[in-house]
Amino acid sequence: MGASSSSALARLGLPARPWPRWLGVAALGLAAVALGTVAWRRAWPRRRRRLQQVGTVAKLWIYPVKSCKGVPVSEAECTAMGLRSGNLRDRFWLVIKEDGHMVTARQEPRLVLISIIYENNCLIFRAPDMDQLVLPSKQPSSNKLHNCRIFGLDIKGRDCGNEAAKWFTNFLKTEAYRLVQFETNMKGRTSRKLLPTLDQNFQVAYPDYCPLLIMTDASLVDLNTRMEKKMKMENFRPNIVVTGCDAFEEDTWDELLIGSVEVKKVMACPRCILTTVDPDTGVIDRKQPLDTLKSYRLCDPSERELYKLSPLFGIYYSVEKIGSLRVGDPVYRMV
């Protein structure tokens, strides 16, 4: 029955005749087919993509405190904000000055001497000539909330207490410092503010730029053939180290599948003076390996606005699909 007939019956106070039942079923069926077709078309590009193995996961590292030693793990959960093992999160803790500005090994090279063990839901900090510091992995909500500053952007941090502040201050011996922790209910620093020229959308806590840094052991071997003093992977602080590929093959990787995790390239990693800090002594060199890297790893002139004169070593990734990964997992390039 047409719309005019239905409205006429309504004016007479009579009920409108119902649509035939078969017509409603048919309409629902057509809608389901249409939605299924749309979903299939959207999924089709992913389904038809080929997986090409490019290497194998050799190492996984979580760096709980920015600029302190990394914690090697055999497996990890990969969240949108980076690697996680239990309550141990990548760069969820940060040393700050009293005014909230971040402190890294660029200013305090001896931070790289602080090691961290995760045990019984606690972080155990150890450093040369210091008693160990034991902190719970979650701070009381009654602790002060700090306004922190990282590369010109604001972010919150929960104070980790006076004992932690005293421990870091006594070890570094320069000025008063405090330790803060990022909480998952806090707002991270967004990629749109960190990297406004790039078209990606993610958040990070206290990393420099991105949730993940991937490197290959072959690229480090290549660098060391040019170096008088050999560098360690710890100089470069990657989250995922890949073996079984050629040097700098990672420059060509866009989207990767590792375990059940899918990641997408954001940019190459522009290297800074932090790489010149010896991870074993905490002494800053200020020249190597930067000078050597600059001799053959500068960006194309067309990318100078993004990278300036920083040499490129390693690749930053965002997390497209969360999941888990482990040492020994094949690394697939999605092509």
UniProtKB/Swiss-Prot annotation:
Annotated MOSC domain residues: 188-334
Modification sites for N6-acetyllysine: 156
BP-aspect Gene Ontology terms: cellular detoxification of nitrogen compound; detoxification of nitrogen compound; nitrate metabolic process; nitric oxide biosynthetic process
EC number assigned by the record: 1.7.-.-
Effect of substituting residue 245 to W: Decreased catalytic activity toward benzamidoxime; no effect on affinity for benzamidoxime; no effect on binding of the molybdenum cofactor
Cofactor info, note text: Binds 1 Mo-molybdopterin (Mo-MPT) cofactor per subunit.
Cofactor entry: Mo-molybdopterin
Keywords on record: Acetylation, Isopeptide bond, Membrane, Mitochondrion, Mitochondrion outer membrane, Molybdenum, Oxidoreductase, Peroxisome, Transit peptide, Ubl conjugation
GO cellular component: mitochondrial outer membrane; mitochondrion; peroxisome
Subcellular location(s) of the protein: Mitochondrion outer membrane; Peroxisome
SUPFAM superfamilies from the UniProt entry: MOSC N-terminal domain-like, PK beta-barrel domain-like
Chemical reaction(s) catalysed: N(omega)-hydroxy-L-arginine + 2 Fe(II)-[cytochrome b5] + 2 H(+) = L-arginine + 2 Fe(III)-[cytochrome b5] + H2O
Pfam families: MOSC (PF03473), MOSC_N (PF03476)
Glycyl lysine isopeptide (Lys-Gly) (interchain with G-Cter in ubiquitin) crosslink residues: 59, 138, 144, 156, 166, 173, 187, 287, 294
Subunit structure: Component of a complex composed of cytochrome b5, NADH-cytochrome b5 reductase (CYB5R3) and MTARC2.
The protein's role, per its UniProt record: Catalyzes the reduction of N-oxygenated molecules, acting as a counterpart of cytochrome P450 and flavin-containing monooxygenases in metabolic cycles. As a component of prodrug-converting system, reduces a multitude of N-hydroxylated prodrugs particularly amidoximes, leading to increased drug bioavailability. May be involved in mitochondrial N(omega)-hydroxy-L-arginine (NOHA) reduction, regulating endogenous nitric oxide levels and biosynthesis.
Protein name in UniProt: Mitochondrial amidoxime reducing component 2
Organism (species): Homo sapiens
Encoding gene (name): MTARC2
